[in-house]
Amino acid sequence: MPISRTYAALVVWLLVPAVAGAQSANAAVAPGSPTADRLPIYEIDPTCPPTLPNDWILGDIRGLFVDDRDHLWVIHMPSSLTPQEIGAAVKPPIADCCFPAPPVLELDPDGKVLRTWGGPGDGYTWYDQEHGIYLDHNGFVWTGTSNGHHVMKFTQDGKHVLTIGTPGVNKGSNDPDHLGGPANFYVEPKTNEIFIADGYI
């Protein structure tokens, strides 16, 4: 199939600014430049997190948040783990290890697990694909799902406070009344309003 001139022009129009932007970005952070000296340097800490208790392992990590105490909040997707990875949890067990960790974990700056929670409970529908975690200015924990069409608010101990959206209900990308797949959230402290990035449809 021949490529139209319009299509070719569009590709060039998109690529030229991208290449130019990448070159200027590289020049802006050249080693020894004043800008490069101010950039943070990150190092991998292979000891964090330490071995989790209870023979727990994490599935796909779907969200991280560092609170004002430097505690790391993690939300992961236990359903992403294979039976071979959680051999002790399958019925009947096929191995001595391991078990899926609860979906939400709080770790202190040293990597010690302080709290865990998440999963099905009374009064709310838990997710099958967890996605995103955020702590607001009042200390509430917000979580979401990439396919369940709702966001939930919890206390730091995992007590359900609020659900926004209707679990399992969405009428497509033009549906003004339901969430698609909320990807992230932010609560504005001045107004106490939540902003939801509805990034998956």
What function would you assign to each model-found segment?
Residues 8-21:
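Bacterial N-terminal signal peptides
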Residues 6-7, 48:
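Hydrophobic alpha-helical segments and their boundary regions
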Residues 23-201:
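Eukaryotic scaffold repeat domains enriched in small/polar residues
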Residues 1-5:
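N-terminal secretory signal peptides that target proteins for export/translocation
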